[in-house]
Amino acid sequence: TGSLPHFFALMMGEKAHIDAQVVGYRGSGPLITDLIGGQVPVAVDTLDTLLPQHEAGKLRILATSGPRRSPFSADIPTFKEAGLDLVATGWNALFAPASMPKDRVARLGAAVEQVMREEATRRLFHDARMVAVASTPAQTAAMLKAYRAQWAPVVQKSGYQP
């Protein structure tokens, strides 16, 4: 599917020395239904998607992939704590055309950074079980560079073609 859970499952399989079979689903809903119903023995998906079913006792999250425990699930260990040296995080960012003038990028970046620091924004993100992170365009570019370096070998090894 080309998603973070897809490539994370491949990376996890390699680190754990298991042959992870990635099965594409048309969204998290059908995946969760099959996981709860026992048609799928294990799955990888985003924490915000799986947490309500975990809290309802319908499935069990074994580990999270962040560098530290999630503030939304402090009872769930990280993969690293569980003995598998894996760290991967998802993120969202605002992008603009490469041709956008630098002064506009700077203004837009400053406005977005300000909004991301507002308490109302932090509450909205928290309610969606996400953490609001304010960053500058330069910080985002650096994060993207590191992200590409982390995932390029996994994507290449998988043979994935968009």
Write out the residue ranges for each language-model feature.
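Conserved, function-defining micro-sites of small-solute handling proteins
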Residues: 1-162
